[in-house]
Amino acid sequence: MNLRAKNASIALAGAALLALGLSACSGTAGATTEEDTATTAGYAVDAETLVFGVVPDSADTETNYQPLMDYIAQETGKTVEYHESTDYAALIEAAIAGKIDVASFSGFTYVTATNNGAELTPISSIVTEEGQEPGYFSQAIVPTASDIQSLADFAGKKVCFVDPSSTSGYLFPSYNLLEEGIDPETDVTPVFAGKHDVSVQKTGEGVECEAGFAEDSEVEKSDKVRIIEETMVPGAPLVYSNTLPDDVKDQLVGILAEVTIDDIIASGVDSADSDGFRSVFFETKPVDDAYYDLIRDICEKTDATQCQG
C-alpha cells in the first residue's frame, strides 16, 4: 500500500484516587472532618491545586507549556503544579492512580491510559498554525547522507523510536513498517530514544540509529536528517480527570475547549507573548473520545502490547 496515499486516508479516517489522609483518625487533634474530605476528594493533591501532567516530548516541554499553565492558574484561581513524568508509562501510571488533574497526552497515551482504567475525558487538541485542524505528522527520517530511500530500506537497520507508548514515535511507525512487511520488533533493531528530539538527534548522528521516527515539530529543527515518509496522526488531547468536581470540569472545558493564543495574551498572561509559545500553540479545538477511534483501529491492526487493557 502506498504510504503517501495512505496518509490522506489516515488523516480523514478503575482510576484510583490518591490517598490523602481521608480515613478518620482517633483523637480530636488529628481527626479528618467531613469538610476536609469534601475539600480534597477528587483532586490529585487538594482543592487549591491542579496537577498538570505532560508526556516528556522534548527538553523544552516545561517551557512550552508554562504559558498555558499560567492561563489555567489565572482563570481557575488555583495553583497549577507541573508534573513531567520520566516516560510515557509513568504518566499513564500517574493517570491511573489519580495523581493528575489535567494533562496533555499523546493520542496513544490517552487510549492506553483509559484502556487500563484511567478516568479521563478529552477537552480539546492544540493546533499550532491558523487554519489547521487537530493533528500532526509522524515522520520517518534518516541521516541526510544516508542511502536509505524508502521505508522498505529500514529492514535490518537500527531504528530509533521514541517510546513504546508514543503515537507518532511508535504506534503509527509500527503500522507503517508492517504495511511494508517489516516487523518493528524483529526485522529492525529498535532503539527507544525516550523523547522526540533525542530520536531526531540520534538518527542525525547515524551511529546508534540508522533511521528513525519523530513528530514533525522536532524534525523541522534539524538539518541533520531528511524525511522519507510522513503520516498524519490524530491531535494530542488536553484532558481532565473525571474525579474532579463537576464545576471544576466545566470550568476547564470553558477555559481550554476553544481558546486562541491571542485570547490568552489578552487575558493578561504575558508569558504567552513569546516566539517559543507561538511555535507550539495557536489555538485549541474541541475533540471527544470518538476522535481517537482511529488509534484504537491501528492498535488492533498492529496488536501493540501497549494497547492492551
Where are the model-predicted features located?
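C-terminal motif of bacterial Sec signal peptides marking the signal peptidase cleavage site
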Residues: A19-A24
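Bacterial signal peptide processing site
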Residues: S26-A29
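An extracytoplasmic/periplasmic, membrane-proximal ligand-sensing/linker region
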Residues: A44-F52, D57-P67, V233, Y240-G309
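Bilobed "Venus flytrap"/periplasmic-binding protein-like clamshell domains
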Residues: A47, V51-A73, S85, F108, ...
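Short helices/loops that flank or line small-molecule/ion binding pockets
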Residues: H83, A89-A103, N116-G117, A152, ...
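Acidic, polar ligand-binding/catalytic clefts
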Residues: E93-D153
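A ligand-binding cleft/hinge motif common to bilobed small-molecule-binding domains
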Residues: S104-A118, N176-E179, Q201-E230
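Short beta-strand->loop
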Residues: L120-Q132, S222-V233, Y240
